[in-house]
């Protein structure tokens, strides 16, 4: 650390630590109306999953009521939630997508 004298005082530079931004999980929530194939398309299109992984996540959503699509910084997570909900509404599906702090 650098020190310098000024008017009889010793000034010492303080090292600041930057923390990584908080991360958020993007979750899909199960419903009784959205087709499983549509959920797979969403996971492939917006979360860059291959078909096998998308199928596993879709089955988790179906069986457990929710599934994690990915973990992202807040702005990216928020954008993905908006994109998924908008895409689902355009195709007249009630698919719910939310984010929560990791």
From Swiss-Prot:
Q: Which top-level group of life is the source organism from? A: Bacteria
BP-aspect Gene Ontology terms: protein catabolic process; proteolysis
Gene name, please?
clpS
Q: What the protein does?
A: Involved in the modulation of the specificity of the ClpAP-mediated ATP-dependent protein degradation.
Q: Which residues form the signal peptide?
A: none
The protein, known as: ATP-dependent Clp protease adapter protein ClpS
Family indicated by similarity: Belongs to the ClpS family.
Q: Whom does it interact with, and what assembly results?
A: Binds to the N-terminal domain of the chaperone ClpA.
